[in-house]
Amino acid sequence: LQIREPFFPILEVVEFAFPKLWPEFCLTVGEMAEMGDNHGLTFIDRSEIRLRVDVYHGVEKKKGRDRLTLAHEVGHFLLHNNPGYARAARNSADIPAYRSSEWQANAFAGALLMPIEFLRTATSLREVAEICGVTSDAAETQTRGLARAGLLNNSALTEIGISRKRKGDHGGSPS
């Protein structure tokens, strides 16, 4: 693919590259009445990612939240290829956050759409959101998580305007 810019073409990769890599893969679009509150679903057993119709159209229009939803589902598809594990881990409150399939899919989506190399040189959260095609909340959450993990140096934190630890910040998901 040789993608060399911070804006990751998530829809193009899923629609055109995934079927070449996994011939059984399909991206489907579900109606709002069918999917309800589910913006996206991944069916590992049948190699399918399903997006709610409004989310699919949002990804087409490069809306940040919808791009993150698709990247999140891609995370499930690539990371959680054991259907039993994916379901069990999603529903377990007794495991550390990082072992949760939902946390992992969020972390994957953040890393995919906001490359750390770009975050290290970005001058503002607004720049991250605009260039990476994500929401400003996602840009802040990803940056804060990487800073907390010690993966962004202090000069980058100063440039982006995120302190290493905010008052009342006790950790959590990186995205």
Located regions from the model:
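Active-site hotspot residues in diverse enzymes, especially metal/ion-binding acidic/histidine motifs
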Residues: 1-175
